[in-house]
UniProtKB/Swiss-Prot annotation:
The keyword Lyase does not apply. GO terms for molecular function: 1-deoxy-D-xylulose-5-phosphate reductoisomerase activity; manganese ion binding; NADPH binding. Pathway: Isoprenoid biosynthesis; isopentenyl diphosphate biosynthesis via DXP pathway; isopentenyl diphosphate from 1-deoxy-D-xylulose 5-phosphate: step 1/6. Pfam families: DXP_redisom_C, DXP_reductoisom, DXPR_C. Its cofactor is Mg(2+); Mn(2+). The lineage of its organism: Bacteria, Pseudomonadati, Pseudomonadota, Gammaproteobacteria, Moraxellales. Its EC number is 1.1.1.267. Belongs to the DXR family. This is 1-deoxy-D-xylulose 5-phosphate reductoisomerase. Mn(2+) binds at residues 152, 154, 233. It comes from the Bacteria. The keyword ATP-binding does not apply. GO terms for biological process: isopentenyl diphosphate biosynthetic process, methylerythritol 4-phosphate pathway involved in terpenoid biosynthetic process.
Length: 402
């Protein structure tokens, strides 16, 4: 790498933002932080602006004026933009080379899709962009010659294990021509792997967000506890790698050392191993097709005491089953599932429902919400309309339990 990449980190104050910015700070010869965005943690965002001095920063619309004053008081000359429109403007800015799409949830969809339509290099951590708008997103990447590189450790691992020809253009090459039989997504099993369903019913928020291997935000930690995170990743993998859900298996691997695998027709399994540190897949995507130092601790093979592989219990982890069923049903169902899950997880984090109620609410939403089927040419307004309807309906489901 010789040219400096100008990076926009959307969702800079979250855990993915932390890991990304740690790498960017250590590699100033390769990367220039052009823009940042944040939503809740504006004090942290201000500190990041002081550290990296971006040209632009995105905040909630209601915070634009106040944040601009705070930047000015700190002696910083940074343009402040607000809301979804501001994020879209940053994502499509001609000065932006690479967009790190790390906004959590459906809120990240408009800016990620806009980046694809602007032909940007996109480092995708926001799985909802593909869960909600998979074919629309992939079509935009193809049509506008954008680049889409996965940041999720599992999808990044699969990407690394695929033949180079597929890495270069996974939208045009049939995997059968390269001997790919199946993809294997690994899952840690979360904090309740060894506990019964009855014990899960009594789980506190503090217990649910305490992941055994990874340091993550609250929402994704709860999704890991219910295995909805793996369900969303299964849907994402179908779109990213252009495979039906029956070609993608999920296996629980409690040590989180093997991050995913590709099974080939000759009987070979190619696996990507590494310490459970998000800086590794982020560094890979930032520098692809080259390699840079991620700053993570290398894996000590001699310290490993064995690797386990366990078939998921789909009664205990019903969210994983629901994700597969939603993928079979179509995009309208994956939108409903994602929206319902976001509302249900928020309710759990606010102590309104039990952890195990999340799957029940998700299943009710999938079974009861009636919406038109979406075509591959659906626009973002149609997608967001279903998302909004599902959220309103799920709010009512939560209210019945709260």
């Amino acid at each position: 790498m010789v040219m400096t990449q100008r990076i926009a980190v959307l969702g800079a104050t979250g855990s993915i933002g932390d890991s990304t910015l740690a790498i960017l700070a250590a590699q100033p010869q390769y990367y220039d932080v052009y823009a940042l965005s944040g939503y809740h943690r504006l004090d942290k965002l201000l500190a990041l602006c002081q550290q990296f001095a971006p040209k632009r920063v995105g905040v909630p619309t209601t915070a634009v004026d106040d944040f601009a004053k705070r930047l000015s008081a700190a002696g910083l000359d940074i343009e402040v933009v607000g809301g979804d429109a501001g994020l879209v403007d940053i994502a499509t800015d001609s000065q932006t080379d690479t967009v790190v799409a790390a906004i959590v949830g459906a809120a990240g969809l408009p800016s990620t899709l806009a980046a694809a339509r602007a032909g940007k290099r996109i480092l995708l951590a926001n799985k909802e962009a593909l869960v909600m708008a998979g074919q629309v997103m992939i079509n935009a990447v193809k049509t506008h010659h954008a680049t889409l590189l996965p940041l999720d450790s599992e999808h990044n691992a699969i990407f690394q294990c695929l033949p180079f020809a597929i890495q270069q253009d996974n939208t045009q090459i049939h995997r059968s021509n390269h001997g790919v039989r199946k993809l294997w997504l690994t899952a840690s099993g979360g904090p309740f792997l060894q506990q019964s369903f009855t014990q899960m019913q009594q789980a506190s928020v503090a217990e649910a967000v305490k992941h055994p291997n990874w340091s993550m935000g609250q929402k994704i930690s709860v999704d890991s506890a219910t295995m909805m995170n793996k369900g969303l990743e299964l849907i994402e993998a179908c779109h990213l790698f252009d495979l039906p859900e029956n070609k993608i298996n999920v296996v629980i691997h409690p040590q989180s050392i093997i991050h995913s695998m590709v099974e080939y027709s000759d009987g070979s399994f190619l696996a990507q191993l590494g310490s459970p540190d998000m800086k590794t897949p982020i560094a890979h995507a930032l520098s692809y097709p080259d390699r840079i130092d991620s700053g993570s601790q290398p894996l000590d093979l001699f310290a490993l005491n064995g690797l386990e592989f366990i078939e998921p219990d789909l009664q205990k982890f019903a969210c994983l089953r629901l994700a597969r069923e939603a993928m079979q049903a179509g995009t309208h169902a994956t939108i409903i599932l994602n929206a319902a899950n976001e509302i249900a997880v928020s309710a759990f984090l606010n102590n309104k429902i039990r952890l195990t109620d999340i799957a029940d609410i998700n299943e009710q939403a999938l079974n009861e919400i009636q919406v038109p089927l979406l075509t591959e040419t659906a626009d973002i307004d149609e997608i967001l309309a279903i998302d909004n309807l599902a959220r309103q309906y799920t709010d009512k489901l939560v209210a019945r339990l709260a």
